[in-house]
From Swiss-Prot:
Documented EC number(s): 3.6.5.-
Protein name per UniProt: Guanine nucleotide-binding protein G(s) subunit alpha isoforms XLas
Taxonomic lineage: Eukaryota, Metazoa, Chordata, Craniata, Vertebrata
Organism (species): Homo sapiens (Human)
G3 motif, as annotated region: 862-871
Region span, G5 motif: 1007-1012
Length: 1037
């Protein structure tokens, strides 16, 4: 398992005494410790990770002379040899290239141990040199330059960053914990352990070590790969079959190797050299040696017993001559280190070959390359006999290969299946060289398992992530030429894989490119790839960006690469640097690769052929088109295009017709609106306002009688039969209203006889039972008017006491038509009673709401609105105030001695004066003239001539009023009546002239609403006034 090479030096062929080439890194002075020390193996990265720290004594850490800890503690210096330092370039600044970076990092359980260097002259010695021999492994990358992930944890550069990480507490500055150094004297507490081991990280989870402190594990290039799920045993265990070597220090500062059997773990490092970490103690380039980050295994303890090894003597077949580490070692064409979900115990590490074996394998590789026989890769059919973890070996084991130059009986040839030191057990079913495990899902390509989803030889599936080189993996021809790696499988009869002719780096890149496209349904796995010193010398380290951005970029680029492979147009060069290298690196190599890939993809587009096909496609035929489907689609699209054009033309025609129809309809609507506007402008709208029971409704009736064919129809009916039908219906309704007026008149007079002061007595007391009958039916609803009602009403109306009470009607509310209907009882009681127009004019119906009447006079349209005159109805007038031509204000002139129904206290004439004033001064009506109808002139003459109710008793101003000179009395009119009616007129004119602004005028008229001729004459006079108002309204006058 590579223990000998780890203990006695790495004497791989082609690495000894090779002079440095031009451009290579110069040889740096190594670290040294004074004193003689037998050549022996230093601790491996596993020891550095797993060795428990002694907690007795702190170790100072210094940076450019600045101490970051307690003073130094003198201790014995050790002179140790390890070729890993020379391989890494001594003290040169080193950061693994993207192709060699690990795709992930893990939380380090501990960083114990140290990584010694070769002794070279010229390097400072002394106590500092002693610390420098142990200290570089103790340093963190960000110990002095920035934040570090955790105590003793290692933060890889972006090339090594993985898409996930384990939580580590951030520590900043120079706050590194004090490292305890045990007493190195013989018998001291740290005699059995490795001095200078740093303490474990607090988050490291591992079981307690069995045995004493210290231990040994081979260096990275000799360790074997591991699985995440418990394959790696970690700690300081040697490979299976070897006992653990405990380095003891005696008084002479010499190592004494003592073999002990104890519970061990397999080393968690695979073919990774120690890393130079910036900020090292005493390093000229501010770098320190750091083992690569690995996971800590969680497998159960395994007892391995074996003979003790003595450090200082090389076993048979191993040459411990110092070699020149500046020349790049020969890397293997092994498979990438994989990390799967389940442990794979078949994998074992094999020791590196000795010089003779390396030479023989190089010769076999040259022969294979000259004969065009490709080297069997990890995914070849012959690779089923090889282990999946051959990345850590110099050459895989070949149990039965006669051409390899090694016999199975030779214990040093690496092919003896029974050699406990070789680590290659041919008979072991778990061994990678066992040919009896062809169906393993992680094997390269077993001939007996062609349907294996992870098999790299699946004919139609892309290469498995674990398969080293699948024959069907999509790769550009230039990729194979650039990488110079043979990825085709070997012949089936090849019993053992041979060493590849190309470098391990190029082969690993090809395998990683093929592994970027997982098989359908296969679970994608994460690989650990071995480093390549060739590229590490060519590609300098790049500054490390923020970790989060690097991971974010990696995940996105990985998804992008999967898309390319799913489409089947990807090249192996796109992923040759690995899953994380595309995002982690930003140097010239990545730029050059991307530039080369772009140049390579351009010739894929044959512009000339595309042009010719598009221009002369009909001549050459569609079969010659590079895109036959697209051409057929164009052909197919021609038919829908013509259909679409016809459909569009049809839709355009329909839309044009629709627009034409809409335009015509719009014109008709506009014409109708214009006509209505003209008719509205030519219509005179008249608003009837006034106090209650002033005669407004009677004026409307008169307009119907005069201009709407009376009550023979509703007006506007062209059919005479319809007019007669409406007339009969309306007259029938008015009969009931007339009977109700008769009943209300007799009831009001009889009830007022006892309420008046002084009360009025009946002239004939025998009519008392008649009074009682009338009072009993006063509040009966839906009275049917029997004949006895008419008899009692007629008898009471002939009584002198009832007549006397009627004369005092001004003291109570009595309808004006009471006397008219009481005088016609004999006519009304008849069953075939048909009211006359005068009866309809006299009928009193309470108006509630707004009633409108349309009529035409001499081809002039009038629209008259009747609004209730009661106080609770006046709030509805506002609806008719907008844009009226004139207001006809109606006043009951005979009501000077009457009170309103609302409170029985306010004089009706005074109420009319107040209402007129409010309308005249209304801000909405200041431009509208008022036609004043002083109505009920017949009743006013009767009261004035009767002399029972004097006007001066209610209006004292009448006593001083004199008839004006411009007064025009009616023919045969009494002067007292003339004086009274002009007094009432002047009362309203006084209001209009007092607040007149010249914008509206008041036109008074004396009217009698029940006199049709009077209303006709008055309305004819008002027509001229209304016409002038109308012209002034539209600014035409």
């Amino acid at each position: 398992m590579g223990v000998r090479n780890c203990l006695y030096g790495n004497n791989m062929s082609g690495q000894r005494d090779i002079p440095p080439e031009i451009g290579e890194q110069p040889e740096q002075p190594p670290l040294e410790a004074p004193g003689a020390a037998a050549p022996g193996a230093g601790p491996s990265p596993a020891e550095e990770m797993e060795t428990e720290p002694p907690h007795n004594e702190p170790i100072p850490v210094e940076n450019d002379g600045e101490a970051c800890g307690p003073p130094e503690v003198s201790r014995p210096n050790f002179q140790v040899l390890n070729p890993a330092f020379r391989e890494a370039g001594a003290h040169g600044s080193y950061s693994p290239p993207p192709e060699e970076a690990m795709p992930f990092e893990a939380e380090q359980p501990s960083l114990g141990g140290f990584w010694p260097t070769l002794e070279q002259p010229g390097f400072p010695s002394g106590v500092h040199a002693g610390l420098e021999a142990f200290g570089p492994a103790l340093m963190e990358p960000g110990a002095f330059s920035g934040a570090r992930p955790g105590l003793g944890g290692y933060s890889p550069p972006p090339e090594e960053a993985m898409p996930f990480e384990f939580d580590q507490p951030a520590q900043r500055g120079c706050s590194q914990l004090l490292l305890q150094v045990p007493d190195l004297a013989p018998g001291g507490p740290g005699a059995a352990g490795v001095p200078g081991a740093p303490p474990e990280e607090p988050q490291a989870l591992r079981p307690a070590k069995a045995g004493s402190r210290g231990g040994y594990s081979p260096p990275p290039e000799e360790t074997m790969p591991f699985e995440l799920d418990g394959e790696g045993f970690g700690d300081d265990s040697p490979p299976p079959g070897l006992s653990r070597v405990i380095a003891q220090v005696d008084g002479s500062s010499q190592f004494a190797a003592v073999a002990a059997s104890s519970a061990v773990r397999l080393t968690p490092a695979a073919n990774a050299p120690p890393l130079w970490v910036p900020g090292a103690i005493g390093s000229p380039s501010q770098e320190a040696v750091r083992p690569p980050s690995n996971f800590t295994g969680s497998s159960p303890w395994m007892e391995i017993s074996g003979p003790p090894f003595e450090i200082g003597s090389a076993p048979a077949g191993v040459d411990d001559t110092p070699v020149n580490m500046d020349s790049p070692p020969i890397a293997l064409d092994g498979p990438p280190i994989k990390v799967s979900g389940a442990p794979d115990k078949r994998e074992r590490a094999e020791r590196p070959p000795v010089e003779e074996e390396a030479a023989e394998m190089e010769g076999a590789a040259d022969a294979a390359e000259g004969g065009k026989v490709p080297s069997p890769g990890y995914g070849s059919p012959a690779a089923g006999a090889a282990s999946a973890d051959t990345a850590a070996r110099a050459a895989p084991a070949a149990p039965a290969d006669p051409d390899s130059g090694a016999t199975p009986e030779d214990p040093d040839s690496g092919t003896a299946p029974a050699d406990p030191d070789s680590g290659a057990f041919a008979a072991d079913p778990d061994s990678g060289a066992a040919p009896a495990a062809p169906a393993d899902p992680d094997s390269g390509a077993a001939p007996d398992a062609p349907a294996d989803p992870d098999s790299g030889a699946a004919p139609d599936a892309p290469a498995d992530p674990d398969a080293g080189a699948a024959p069907e993996a999509p790769a550009a021809p230039a990729a194979a030429e650039t990488r110079a790696a043979h990825v085709a499988p070997a012949a089936p009869d090849a019993g053992a894989p041979t060493a590849p002719a190309a470098s391990a780096t190029r082969a690993a890149q090809v395998r990683r490119a093929a592994s970027a496209a997982p098989a359908s349904g296969a679970r994608r796995k994460i690989h650990l790839r071995p480093p390549s010193p060739e590229i590490q010398a060519a590609d300098p380290p790049t500054p490390r960006p923020t970790r989060a951005s690097a991971w974010r970029g990696k995940s996105e680029s990985s998804r992008g690469r999967r898309v390319y492979y799913d489409e089947g147009v990807a090249s192996s060069d796109d992923d040759s640097s690995g899953d994380e290298s595309d995002d982690g690196t930003s140097g010239c190599l990545r730029w050059f690769q991307h530039r080369r890939n772009r140049r390579r993809r351009k010739p894929q587009r044959n512009l000339l052929r595309n042009f010719l096909v598009q221009a002369f496609g009909g001549c050459f035929g569609r079969s010659e088109s590079p895109q036959p489907k697209a051409s057929r689609s164009l052909k197919v699209k021609k038919v829908p295009l013509a259909e679409k054009r016809r459909q569009m033309r049809k839709e355009a025609l329909e839309k044009r017709a629709q627009k034409r129809a809409e335009k015509k309809r719009s014109k008709l609507i506009d014409k109708q609106l214009q006509d209505e506007k003209m008719g509205y402008m030519c219509t005179h709208r008249l608003l009837l306002l006034g106090a209650g029971e002033s005669g407004k409704s009677t004026i409307v009736k008169q307009m119907r009688i005069l201009h709407v064919n009376g009550f023979n129809g509703e007006g506007g009916e062209e059919d005479p039969q319809a007019a007669r039908s409406n007339s009969d219906g309306e007259k029938a309704t008015k009969v009931q209203d007339i009977k109700n007026n008769l009943k209300e008149a007799i009831e009001t007079i009889v009830a007022a006889m006892s309420n008046l002061v002084p009360p009025v007595e009946l002239a004939n007391p025998e009519n008392q039972f008649r009074v009682d009958y009338i009072l009993s039916v006063m509040n009966v609803p839906d009275f049917d008017f029997p004949p006895e009602f008419y008899e009692h009403a007629k008898a009471l109306w002939e009584d002198e006491g009832v007549r006397a009470c009627y004369e005092r009607s001004n003291e109570y509310q009595l309808i004006d038509c009471a006397q008219y209907f009481l005088d016609k009882i004999d006519v009304i009681k008849q069953a075939d009673y048909v009211p006359s127009d005068q009866d309809l004019l006299r009928c009193r119906v309470l108006t509630s709401g707004i009633f409108e009447t349309k009529f035409q006079v001499d081809k002039v349209n009038f629209h008259m609105f009747d609004v209730g005159g009661q106080r609770d109805e006046r709030r509805k007038w506002i609806q008719c105030f907008n844009d009226v031509t004139a207001i006809i204000f109606v006043v009951a002139s005979s009501s000077y001695n009457m009170v309103i129904r609302e409170d029985n206290q306010t004089n009706r004439l005074q109420e009319a004066l107040n209402l007129f004033k409010s309308i005249w001064n209304n801000r909405w009506l200041r431009t509208i003239s008022v036609i004043l109808f002083l109505n009920k002139q017949d009743l006013l003459a009767e009261k004035v001539l009767a002399g029972k109710s004097k006007i001066e008793d209610y209006f004292p101003e009448f006593a001083r009023y004199t008839t004006p000179e411009d007064a025009t009395p009616e023919p045969g009119e009494d002067p007292r009546v003339t004086r009274a009616k002009y007094f009432i007129r002047d009362e309203f004119l006084r209001i209009s002239t007092a607040s007149g602004d010249g914008r509206h005028y008041c036109y008074p008229h004396f009217t009698c609403a029940v006199d049709t001729e009077n209303i006709r004459r008055v309305f004819n006079d008002c027509r001229d006034i209304i016409q002038r108002m109308h012209l002034r309204q539209y600014e035409l006058l």
